[in-house]
Amino acid sequence: MQREYDYIIIGAGSAGNVLAARLTEDPGVSVLLLEAGGPDYRLDFRTQMPAALAFPLQGRRYNWAYETEPEPHMDNRRMECGRGKGLGGSSLINGMCYIRGNALDFDHWAKRPGLEDWGYRDVLPYFRKAETRDIGANDYHGGEGPVSVATPKNDNNVLFQAMVDAGVQAGYPRTDDLNGYQQEGFGPMDRTVTPQGRRASTARGYLDMAKPRDSLHIVTHATTDRILFAGKRAVGVHYLVGNSSEGIDAHARREVLVCAGAIASPQLLQRSGVGAPDLLRALDVQLVHDLPGVGQNLQDHLEVYMQYACTKPVSLYPALQWWNQPAIGAEWLFAGTGTGASNQFEAGGFIRTREEFDWPNIQYHFLPVAINYNGSNAVKEHGFQAHVGSMRTPSRGRVHARSRDPRQHPSILFNYQSTDQDWQEFRDAIRITREIIAQPALDPYRGREISPSADCKTDAELDAFVRARAETAYHPSCSCAMGTDDMAVVDGQGRVHGMEGLRVIDASIMPRIITGNLNATTIMIAEKIVDRIRGRAPLPRSTADYYVAGDAPVRR
């Protein structure tokens, strides 16, 4: 087997697959793509059927199933931190919500020294390059990219439109495209689903395009033990296949590209000798480079589920009954349509809770059934729910490798809800949600409040509910942040500071978490940086307009 390549990519996820496909477009460029998980089996409904999105989170085949340390502000709960394992990474198990973030997220990135070319108009062309939207291209959307994006259709569940209308009746804006001119407001939510009703992971979009090339070598069940260095230059990797303890060395002529995600990328750097000296000393790892920001600045989105009974039999509750599932599965399998072909997050919104926020600080996902995201605790009646959570928490956490063993999970602490702002935002969010649900648009459907329940009212009661019941939105990020400050890990091209031939390219390099789901932005980051790796000129900046709230009131 060939053991020398131009590039070695660690992690076949949302970013790694983009790099593998784009780098091998160039003749004569060889790539080794290492993935610790297995293939993305196309006949496994658990990952391929959009409506089955809870299933991969319940097992270990496709999910690393990390857990946090006891979270001190969350009743010391050990909280889930699911991450994708297998070709596609977290795009193989995520909720398929296609949300890019707010334009001002990127404009604020670009205000940081060294990140001047990460403004919204710089990144929008790369969002478009990656996308094929089912209703065609425009100034904001692409029509020729590897990622299939489906838009909600008029014949979907009546509760979606009712919830959007209720948000507008409560005084918030309506938007026809959460990824278009104006993110702020309520409207339909796009999803990464193919025209055939299948999950559009990066394995399907990018790897399918690249697999026929002889220059791409993919190894699954390959756990990267450590990066190999000659001085300060990354020259290869040492990896293990399956349960073997016998490692394999592979050498990179040009670069090693770390795309293992916001949990595993910093863990790998630390195990390889790049990180804070005190931590490496405790792990008995020889210091290659002192970089204290590795694993710091960890951020996530937290959310609560506001659940309501539905007084009409229009929710998806019947789809949870086993006797209805064969028909749903058959329609999806043979026609690619029906309940199974949607992730059921077809409406949502972004709002500002207070005038002090320049762009939305709260996100909504609407779901026409009352159930936990991971499929647990389904309410045994017709119901619906709003997932609501804050977007740019000031709380910061960290990821630390526990040992040199690549198969041991790292120590993860998000430090959720560690600031006063966190608590104020969740109190506001719960109270605003109740105002929205009380609007006339939901009069035909609204039953009692199931969770947290109508008698949960005071600040103390709401805080107790958040501590006991809030869950991750599965958006870990920022643990190898881009920038030039002392705690930055990479520059604006993903190059690890102080090193040669080594980049990190995934959600970990976001300097600050974005307003929304992370998958689309992670793909964009990879598309943008791979142009630089290939020596290509950046795509021309967009000239598209975008909404800035300015002095506009939070609600009418």
Swiss-Prot record:
One of its GO terms (molecular function) is flavin adenine dinucleotide binding. GO terms for cellular component: membrane. Its cofactor is FAD. InterPro entries: BetA (IPR011533), FAD/NAD-bd_sf (IPR036188), GMC_OxRdtase (IPR012132), GMC_OxRdtase_N (IPR000172), GMC_OxRtase_C (IPR007867). One of its GO terms (biological process) is glycine betaine biosynthetic process from choline. The active site is at 475 (proton acceptor). The keyword Coiled coil does not apply. Its EC number is 1.1.99.1, 1.2.1.8. It is an enzyme of class 1 (oxidoreductase). Pathway: Amine and polyamine biosynthesis; betaine biosynthesis via choline pathway; betaine aldehyde from choline (cytochrome c reductase route): step 1/1. Belongs to the GMC oxidoreductase family. This is Oxygen-dependent choline dehydrogenase. It comes from Xanthomonas campestris pv. campestris (strain ATCC 33913 / DSM 3586 / NCPPB 528 / LMG 568 / P 25). The gene is betA.
